[in-house]
Amino acid sequence: MARKSIIARNERRKELVEKYAAKREELKKAGDYEALRKLPRDSSATRVRNRCVLTGRGRGNYEKFGLCRNMFRKLALEGKLPGVRKASW
């Protein structure tokens, strides 16, 4: 499991992205890159990492489910993900 501080940092970044989204878009359209540069670094969407909602794992995530591959497999085999079943042909 990822450290709690890493998960918390990512959550703060998500909040900043949401807070500054409209302003960033407005500045981009105006071409005011100097003002864009003065915004907080973490308000850029590229700094947000997709993480597993259960474990906080930062790699191997299925965006549709919000889970890492390990938790996805575990929950799918337990039948806890509706509409998901093991392939067989």
From Swiss-Prot:
It holds the Pfam family Ribosomal_S14. GO terms for biological process: translation. InterPro entries: Ribosomal_uS14, Ribosomal_uS14_bac/plastid, Ribosomal_uS14_CS, Ribosomal_uS14_sf. Gene3D superfamilies: 30s Ribosomal Protein S14, Chain N. GO terms for molecular function: rRNA binding; structural constituent of ribosome. Keywords: Ribonucleoprotein, Ribosomal protein, RNA-binding, rRNA-binding. The keyword rRNA-binding applies. NCBIfam families: PRK08881.1. Binds 16S rRNA, required for the assembly of 30S particles and may also be responsible for determining the conformation of the 16S rRNA at the A site. Part of the 30S ribosomal subunit. Contacts proteins S3 and S10. This is Small ribosomal subunit protein uS14. It comes from Chlorobaculum parvum (strain DSM 263 / NCIMB 8327) (Chlorobium vibrioforme subsp. thiosulfatophilum).
